[in-house]
Protein backbone atom coordinates (compact mmCIF):
# COMPACT_ATOMS: atom_id res chain seq x y z
CA UNK A 1 0.00 0.00 0.00
CA UNK A 2 3.03 2.28 -0.08
CA UNK A 3 2.13 3.73 -3.51
CA UNK A 4 -1.52 4.26 -2.65
CA UNK A 5 -2.47 7.93 -2.55
CA UNK A 6 -4.21 8.66 0.76
CA UNK A 7 -6.44 11.71 1.22
CA UNK A 8 -8.62 12.99 4.03
CA UNK A 9 -12.17 14.16 3.41
CA UNK A 10 -15.54 14.44 5.06
CA UNK A 11 -17.99 11.64 4.33
CA UNK A 12 -20.58 14.28 3.46
CA UNK A 13 -18.39 15.46 0.55
CA UNK A 14 -19.00 12.24 -1.36
CA UNK A 15 -22.51 13.06 -2.71
CA UNK A 16 -21.32 16.28 -4.36
CA UNK A 17 -18.25 14.46 -5.69
CA UNK A 18 -20.37 11.70 -7.24
CA UNK A 19 -22.65 14.24 -8.92
CA UNK A 20 -19.76 16.24 -10.33
CA UNK A 21 -18.11 13.09 -11.71
CA UNK A 22 -21.39 12.31 -13.49
CA UNK A 23 -21.45 15.86 -14.93
CA UNK A 24 -24.37 16.94 -12.75
CA UNK A 25 -24.14 20.26 -10.93
CA UNK A 26 -24.83 19.83 -7.20
CA UNK A 27 -27.36 22.26 -5.71
CA UNK A 28 -25.59 25.41 -4.55
CA UNK A 29 -25.07 25.84 -0.79
CA UNK A 30 -27.14 22.74 -0.01
CA UNK A 31 -24.54 20.01 0.45
CA UNK A 32 -20.78 20.13 1.13
CA UNK A 33 -18.39 20.85 -1.73
CA UNK A 34 -16.95 18.01 -3.82
CA UNK A 35 -13.43 16.70 -3.18
CA UNK A 36 -11.21 18.60 -5.68
CA UNK A 37 -8.44 15.97 -5.90
CA UNK A 38 -10.95 13.27 -6.82
CA UNK A 39 -12.50 15.45 -9.52
CA UNK A 40 -9.05 16.10 -10.99
CA UNK A 41 -8.16 12.40 -11.01
CA UNK A 42 -11.39 10.96 -12.36
CA UNK A 43 -13.08 13.64 -14.46
CA UNK A 44 -14.48 12.11 -17.63
CA UNK A 45 -15.41 8.67 -16.30
CA UNK A 46 -18.62 7.29 -17.80
CA UNK A 47 -20.12 5.30 -14.92
CA UNK A 48 -19.63 4.69 -11.20
CA UNK A 49 -20.01 1.39 -9.37
CA UNK A 50 -20.21 1.62 -5.55
CA UNK A 51 -19.74 -1.32 -3.19
CA UNK A 52 -20.69 -0.47 0.40
CA UNK A 53 -19.29 -3.05 2.85
CA UNK A 54 -20.37 -3.25 6.48
CA UNK A 55 -17.68 -3.78 9.15
CA UNK A 56 -14.89 -2.58 6.88
CA UNK A 57 -12.56 0.36 7.39
CA UNK A 58 -8.98 1.51 7.65
CA UNK A 59 -8.15 -1.17 10.22
CA UNK A 60 -9.55 -4.04 8.16
CA UNK A 61 -7.90 -3.12 4.86
CA UNK A 62 -4.56 -2.62 6.62
CA UNK A 63 -4.73 -5.65 8.91
CA UNK A 64 -6.52 -8.18 6.67
CA UNK A 65 -5.08 -6.97 3.34
CA UNK A 66 -7.83 -8.12 0.93
CA UNK A 67 -5.89 -9.05 -2.19
CA UNK A 68 -7.83 -7.36 -4.99
CA UNK A 69 -8.41 -4.10 -3.14
CA UNK A 70 -4.78 -3.82 -2.07
CA UNK A 71 -3.46 -4.57 -5.57
CA UNK A 72 -5.77 -2.28 -7.55
CA UNK A 73 -6.68 0.70 -5.37
CA UNK A 74 -5.40 4.04 -6.63
CA UNK A 75 -6.73 6.37 -3.95
CA UNK A 76 -7.90 5.82 -0.39
CA UNK A 77 -10.09 8.43 1.28
CA UNK A 78 -10.08 8.53 5.07
CA UNK A 79 -13.61 9.69 5.79
CA UNK A 80 -14.30 11.91 8.77
CA UNK A 81 -17.79 11.55 10.24
CA UNK A 82 -19.63 11.79 13.54
CA UNK A 83 -21.51 8.58 12.74
CA UNK A 84 -19.47 5.80 11.07
CA UNK A 85 -22.16 3.11 11.43
CA UNK A 86 -24.25 1.69 8.59
CA UNK A 87 -27.39 3.81 8.83
CA UNK A 88 -25.39 6.94 9.60
CA UNK A 89 -23.22 6.38 6.53
CA UNK A 90 -26.21 5.63 4.29
CA UNK A 91 -27.95 8.76 5.56
CA UNK A 92 -24.97 11.01 4.91
CA UNK A 93 -24.38 9.55 1.44
CA UNK A 94 -28.00 9.98 0.41
CA UNK A 95 -28.70 13.37 2.01
CA UNK A 96 -25.25 14.95 2.23
CA UNK A 97 -25.63 15.36 5.99
CA UNK A 98 -27.79 14.35 8.93
CA UNK A 99 -30.98 16.13 7.88
CA UNK A 100 -33.61 14.39 5.76
CA UNK A 101 -33.69 15.86 2.25
CA UNK A 102 -32.10 19.20 3.23
CA UNK A 103 -33.53 21.80 0.87
CA UNK A 104 -34.97 18.90 -1.11
CA UNK A 105 -31.64 17.14 -1.77
CA UNK A 106 -31.56 13.38 -2.29
CA UNK A 107 -28.53 11.92 -4.09
CA UNK A 108 -30.31 9.30 -6.19
CA UNK A 109 -33.13 11.68 -7.15
CA UNK A 110 -30.54 14.29 -8.11
CA UNK A 111 -28.81 11.75 -10.37
CA UNK A 112 -32.11 10.81 -12.03
CA UNK A 113 -33.20 14.44 -12.37
CA UNK A 114 -29.84 15.14 -14.01
CA UNK A 115 -30.68 12.72 -16.81
CA UNK A 116 -28.65 9.79 -15.46
CA UNK A 117 -29.79 6.39 -14.22
CA UNK A 118 -29.12 4.72 -10.88
CA UNK A 119 -29.80 1.39 -9.22
CA UNK A 120 -29.50 0.57 -5.50
CA UNK A 121 -29.27 -3.08 -4.40
CA UNK A 122 -29.61 -3.82 -0.71
CA UNK A 123 -31.82 -4.82 2.18
CA UNK A 124 -35.56 -4.14 1.83
CA UNK A 125 -35.76 -1.93 4.94
CA UNK A 126 -32.81 0.19 3.84
CA UNK A 127 -34.23 0.56 0.34
CA UNK A 128 -37.62 1.64 1.67
CA UNK A 129 -35.89 4.25 3.81
CA UNK A 130 -33.40 5.60 1.29
CA UNK A 131 -34.21 4.96 -2.38
CA UNK A 132 -36.61 7.93 -2.61
CA UNK A 133 -38.66 6.13 -5.24
CA UNK A 134 -35.68 5.62 -7.58
CA UNK A 135 -34.84 2.22 -9.09
CA UNK A 136 -33.85 -0.31 -6.45
CA UNK A 137 -33.70 -4.08 -6.02
CA UNK A 138 -34.17 -5.73 -2.63
CA UNK A 139 -31.95 -8.72 -1.82
CA UNK A 140 -31.68 -10.72 1.40
CA UNK A 141 -28.12 -12.05 1.08
CA UNK A 142 -24.78 -10.84 -0.20
CA UNK A 143 -24.64 -13.70 -2.70
CA UNK A 144 -27.92 -12.61 -4.30
CA UNK A 145 -26.73 -8.98 -4.29
CA UNK A 146 -23.54 -9.98 -6.10
CA UNK A 147 -25.42 -12.08 -8.67
CA UNK A 148 -27.77 -9.15 -9.35
CA UNK A 149 -24.87 -6.70 -9.56
CA UNK A 150 -23.67 -8.27 -12.82
CA UNK A 151 -26.92 -7.11 -14.45
CA UNK A 152 -26.66 -3.47 -13.39
CA UNK A 153 -23.03 -2.34 -13.22
CA UNK A 154 -22.81 -1.60 -16.95
CA UNK A 155 -26.43 -0.57 -17.53
CA UNK A 156 -26.65 2.35 -15.07
CA UNK A 157 -24.61 5.50 -14.62
CA UNK A 158 -24.47 4.76 -10.88
CA UNK A 159 -24.84 1.25 -9.47
CA UNK A 160 -24.72 0.77 -5.70
CA UNK A 161 -24.43 -2.62 -3.99
CA UNK A 162 -24.61 -3.00 -0.21
CA UNK A 163 -22.86 -6.04 1.33
CA UNK A 164 -24.24 -6.62 4.81
CA UNK A 165 -24.27 -10.37 5.59
CA UNK A 166 -22.28 -9.85 8.79
CA UNK A 167 -25.28 -8.79 10.87
CA UNK A 168 -27.39 -11.91 10.30
CA UNK A 169 -24.47 -14.36 10.27
CA UNK A 170 -23.10 -12.91 13.50
CA UNK A 171 -26.49 -13.37 15.21
CA UNK A 172 -26.64 -16.99 14.01
CA UNK A 173 -23.15 -17.74 15.21
CA UNK A 174 -23.77 -16.13 18.59
CA UNK A 175 -26.70 -18.51 19.09
CA UNK A 176 -24.59 -21.50 18.01
CA UNK A 177 -21.47 -20.22 19.81
CA UNK A 178 -19.49 -20.63 16.60
CA UNK A 179 -16.74 -18.45 15.15
CA UNK A 180 -15.64 -15.16 16.70
CA UNK A 181 -16.80 -11.90 15.09
CA UNK A 182 -13.17 -11.21 14.15
CA UNK A 183 -13.00 -14.47 12.18
CA UNK A 184 -16.34 -13.78 10.53
CA UNK A 185 -15.31 -10.26 9.47
CA UNK A 186 -12.13 -11.64 7.92
CA UNK A 187 -13.98 -14.39 6.06
CA UNK A 188 -16.62 -12.02 4.68
CA UNK A 189 -14.15 -9.35 3.60
CA UNK A 190 -11.97 -11.85 1.74
CA UNK A 191 -15.04 -13.38 0.10
CA UNK A 192 -16.42 -9.99 -0.92
CA UNK A 193 -12.98 -9.00 -2.22
CA UNK A 194 -13.16 -11.91 -4.69
CA UNK A 195 -16.68 -10.97 -5.74
CA UNK A 196 -15.72 -7.35 -6.34
CA UNK A 197 -12.80 -8.55 -8.47
CA UNK A 198 -15.39 -10.34 -10.61
CA UNK A 199 -17.36 -7.10 -10.97
CA UNK A 200 -14.20 -5.19 -11.85
CA UNK A 201 -13.43 -7.62 -14.67
CA UNK A 202 -16.97 -7.18 -16.01
CA UNK A 203 -17.01 -3.39 -15.84
CA UNK A 204 -16.65 -1.57 -19.13
CA UNK A 205 -13.66 0.65 -19.74
CA UNK A 206 -13.69 4.17 -18.30
CA UNK A 207 -15.65 3.14 -15.21
CA UNK A 208 -14.89 4.17 -11.64
CA UNK A 209 -15.24 1.60 -8.88
CA UNK A 210 -15.60 2.90 -5.33
CA UNK A 211 -15.50 0.62 -2.29
CA UNK A 212 -16.85 2.27 0.86
CA UNK A 213 -16.48 0.76 4.31
CA UNK A 214 -18.55 1.50 7.41
CA UNK A 215 -18.47 0.26 11.02
CA UNK A 216 -21.53 -1.99 10.67
CA UNK A 217 -25.00 -1.71 12.20
CA UNK A 218 -23.88 -1.61 15.82
CA UNK A 219 -20.67 -1.30 17.82
CA UNK A 220 -19.06 -4.68 18.45
CA UNK A 221 -17.08 -5.92 21.41
CA UNK A 222 -14.11 -7.46 19.62
CA UNK A 223 -11.37 -9.53 21.20
CA UNK A 224 -8.32 -7.82 19.73
CA UNK A 225 -5.74 -6.92 22.36
CA UNK A 226 -2.80 -4.56 22.86
CA UNK A 227 -1.75 -2.35 19.96
CA UNK A 228 -4.09 -4.13 17.54
CA UNK A 229 -7.06 -3.24 19.76
CA UNK A 230 -5.94 0.41 19.86
CA UNK A 231 -5.50 0.36 16.10
CA UNK A 232 -9.01 -1.04 15.64
CA UNK A 233 -10.49 1.55 18.01
CA UNK A 234 -8.94 4.36 15.94
CA UNK A 235 -10.21 2.97 12.62
CA UNK A 236 -12.26 5.25 10.37
CA UNK A 237 -14.58 4.62 7.42
CA UNK A 238 -12.82 4.63 4.07
CA UNK A 239 -13.49 4.87 0.37
CA UNK A 240 -11.05 3.29 -2.04
CA UNK A 241 -11.17 4.22 -5.70
CA UNK A 242 -9.94 2.57 -8.86
CA UNK A 243 -10.50 3.31 -12.53
CA UNK A 244 -11.22 0.49 -14.98
Regions found by a protein language model. Give the residues of each.
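Feature captures the catalytic ectodomains and active-site-proximal regions of enzymes
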Residues: 1-244
